[in-house]
């Protein structure tokens, strides 16, 4: 297994330009493919999850050309008419590709099979499939009920009224919303339970609106989408920088001192994970806000007790910031960490204890008391990009650390360790 040794970093200084947002990149690619006309997508993220979406779209007959850096894509939309692929669509462990494609392919004519990595077969999709079947969708499980892989015969959905559980993953609702304009009739979606990660739904609604589709909702409890609609291409669309990726550099400046300018997200960001910067201000970081950039400096860091339901991905970074804060930190309402790339709640608790922290792992919360003494250990990353990037913060705090399987960061931020080195002193 490959390992990366990170020596202590005394301070950070410089400027970071963020890669494009994963959440936005895959939503935009899919809607550009479904649209009538050609869309140029700029600042596209080049990562494993995006490559899985691009590979699937090309098998579905969508013509996509990329620049040499793979950050600008020219997508020739097919107007909602895909060809039946000759082979299964392999989507790795990319939930932002697998879930929306499940719903969209159920809505358009053709026969499709969606497969993925072993971890994808452990990530639940039953709530989405139940909703699509209730609307007339023809979807069968190839192995285990409620989990991928799936076989789909598309074009059977007429619309109607359906309820979907919002408490596990917002990606189920995102998938339904993106597919609903393609259904033959109008659709009313009612949310059961508490909707998690609500800001990710705002991203979905924002992107749909830019491609010409309006969704009515009553305070996120019900959503109404007219059927028989067509997405309209945009000449050009810019992918905002990834706010989840920004969290590591906000944290680095807050922990180590120095000053980091983060370009690509700011006060005008549409991503919920920008809320991490507001949490870090509560912790003690000093942040200057501009429309499309942040400037972050160190402050006296104190433990906090927060509900992180709106920022689940970025909140992981807070768990390693907690190692360097004064007093304990509690991160609550994060059950959906358990159904991500790995069971992140258990994984983070395990690795934080290795470093020397006292940790309480609850059903949907984690409490962290900083170490009295830091252990020089190798961090297992569980094939989870965010765990690798989070624990790099230990080195930023002036303690040596080893990261196992550092290339797992290729899922969202292939150049992460190089970028961190470029601002480290």
Swiss-Prot record:
Catalytic activity: 3-phosphoshikimate + phosphoenolpyruvate = 5-O-(1-carboxyvinyl)-3-phosphoshikimate + phosphate
Localization of this protein: Cytoplasm
Main location: cytoplasm
Any one GO molecular-function label of the UniProt entry: 3-phosphoshikimate 1-carboxyvinyltransferase activity
UniProt-listed Enzyme Commission number(s): 2.5.1.19
GO cellular component: cytoplasm
Enzyme active site: 313
Binding residues for 3-phosphoshikimate: 22-23, 27, 169-171, 197, 313, 336, 340
Self-association state and partner proteins as the record states: Monomer.
Family: Belongs to the EPSP synthase family.
Protein name: 3-phosphoshikimate 1-carboxyvinyltransferase
Species annotation: Pseudoalteromonas translucida (strain TAC 125)
Organism taxonomic ancestry: Bacteria, Pseudomonadati, Pseudomonadota, Gammaproteobacteria, Alteromonadales
């Amino acid at each position: 297994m490959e390992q990366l040794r990170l020596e202590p970093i005394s301070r950070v200084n410089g400027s970071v330009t963020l890669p494009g947002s994963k959440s936005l990149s895959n939503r935009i690619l899919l809607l550009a493919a479904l649209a009538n006309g050609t869309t140029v997508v700029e600042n596209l993220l080049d990562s494993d999850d995006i490559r899985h979406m691009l590979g699937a779209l090309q098998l579905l007959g969508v013509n996509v050309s990329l620049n040499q850096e793979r950050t600008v894509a020219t997508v020739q939309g097919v107007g909602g008419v895909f060809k039946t692929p000759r082979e299964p669509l392999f989507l790795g462990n990319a939930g932002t590709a697998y879930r929306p494609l499940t719903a969209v392919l159920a809505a358009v004519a053709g026969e499709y099979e969606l497969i993925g990595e072993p971890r994808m077969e452990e990530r639940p999709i039953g709530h989405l499939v139940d909703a699509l079947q209730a609307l007339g969708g023809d979807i069968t499980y190839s192995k285990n009920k409620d989990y991928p892989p799936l076989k789909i015969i598309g074009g059977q959905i007429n619309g109607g009224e359906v309820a979907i559980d919002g408490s596990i993953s917002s990606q189920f609702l995102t998938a339904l919303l993106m597919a609903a304009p393609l259904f033959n009739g109008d659709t009313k979606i009612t949310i059961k339970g508490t909707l998690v990660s609500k800001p990710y739904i705002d991203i979905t609604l924002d992107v749909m609106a830019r491609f010409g589709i309006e969704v009515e909702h009553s305070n996120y409890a019900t959503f109404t989408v007219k059927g028989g609609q067509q997405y309209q291409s945009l000449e050009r669309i810019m992918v905002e920088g990834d706010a989840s990726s920004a969290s590591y550099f906000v944290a680095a400046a807050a922990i180590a001192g120095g000053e980091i300018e983060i370009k690509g997200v700011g006060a005008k960001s549409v991503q919920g994970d920008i809320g991490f910067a507001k949490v870090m201000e509560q912790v003690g970081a000093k942040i200057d806000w501009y429309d499309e950039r942040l400037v972050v400096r160190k402050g006296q860091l104190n433990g906090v007790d927060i509900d992180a339901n709106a920022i689940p991905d970025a909140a992981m970074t807070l768990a390693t910031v907690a190692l360097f804060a004064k007093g304990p930190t509690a991160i609550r309402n994060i059950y959906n960490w358990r159904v991500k790339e790995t069971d992140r709640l258990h994984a983070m608790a395990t690795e934080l204890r290795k470093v020397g922290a006292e940790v309480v792992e609850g059903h949907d919360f984690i409490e962290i008391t900083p170490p009295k003494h830091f252990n020089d250990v190798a961090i297992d990353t569980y094939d989870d990009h965010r765990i690798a990037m989070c624990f790099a913060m230990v080195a930023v705090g002036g303690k040596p650390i080893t990261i196992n399987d550092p290339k797992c960061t290729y899922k969202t931020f292939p150049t992460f360790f190089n970028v961190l080195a470029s601002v480290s002193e």
